[in-house]
Structure formats: C-alpha cells, structure tokens
Design a protein with these regions (language model features):
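Polytopic transmembrane helical bundles with strong interfacial aromatic enrichment
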Residues: 2-133
C-alpha cells in the first residue's frame, strides 16, 4: 500500500500487525461461515427429501464448526493482544493496563462493546457445538 496516498498505512518500527490481520481474517471467515450455516440449516429444515436434508445438515454442521473455530481464534488473538500489552491496538490501549493482574486482564474482554459482542459470540458457539453434537 502506498503511504503517500494513505498516511494511515504507515508502519512503525516494532509495530506488531500480525494479530490484527489474523483477527480480521478470522472475523471475515466467521461471518461467511455463519451465513452458510444459517442458509444450510434453513434448507435442511425445509427440504422434504431425506438425502438432500442430510446433505444440507452436514454442510450446516461443517460451516458452524468453521465459524466456531474462527470465533475461538478471534478470542485467542484478542487475549494475545491484551495479555502482551500491544497498545498499538485501540482495544488494548483503551481497556487494559500493564499493572493489571491476570484476572483483570481477562475481564478486559467484555469491558468494551466489541469484546462483549465477542464474548456473546463465544458462548453462542459453545452452546451451538453442544447442541449439534
């Protein structure tokens, strides 16, 4: 990316961009897998033929498992960012501190709106995995 046309693209020395890029990729894959799972579960519910119903159900289960893995990975990436005090990320900068003990670092997850939404997604995936198994 050309930094002359996009000044926000400047990369500073020692800046750790990989967690943000991984989180972005996991988020996109999670949303796409969620849409595929929703569509597939609906098709499985409304299909009358057993073989097609089983096929749609299998696709829905696989898509939901992919969504769950991506949500868990996002949770892990955010934990990495917070626990390693990567303050180049706004969420870590706004919701954590170097002096916080571990249990308070863990509670930084749901302090902000984004982390709270991630926590709800996490529990949605846990309960969904219990239900489909």
């Amino acid at each position: 990316m050309n930094t002359a046309t996009n000044p926000a693209a400047v990369q500073f020395i020692g800046e750790n961009l990989l967690p943000g890029q991984l989180g972005y990729i996991f988020t996109i894959v999670s949303v796409v897998a969620s849409l595929v799972a929703t569509f597939s579960f609906a098709k499985a519910f409304y299909t009358n033929e057993i073989t097609q119903q089983n096929s749609w159900q299998r696709l829905a289960n696989i898509a939901f498992i992919i969504e769950s893995v991506c949500v868990f990975a996002c949770f892990g990436v955010l934990f990495y960012v917070i626990s390693n005090h990567l303050f180049e990320y706004k969420y870590a900068y706004m919701h954590s501190d170097k002096n916080l003990p571990f249990e308070y670092l863990l509670s930084c997850f749901w302090e902000g709106q984004e982390g709270s939404f991630l926590l709800w997604s996490f529990w949605h995936c846990v309960l969904g995995l219990i239900i489909i198994n």
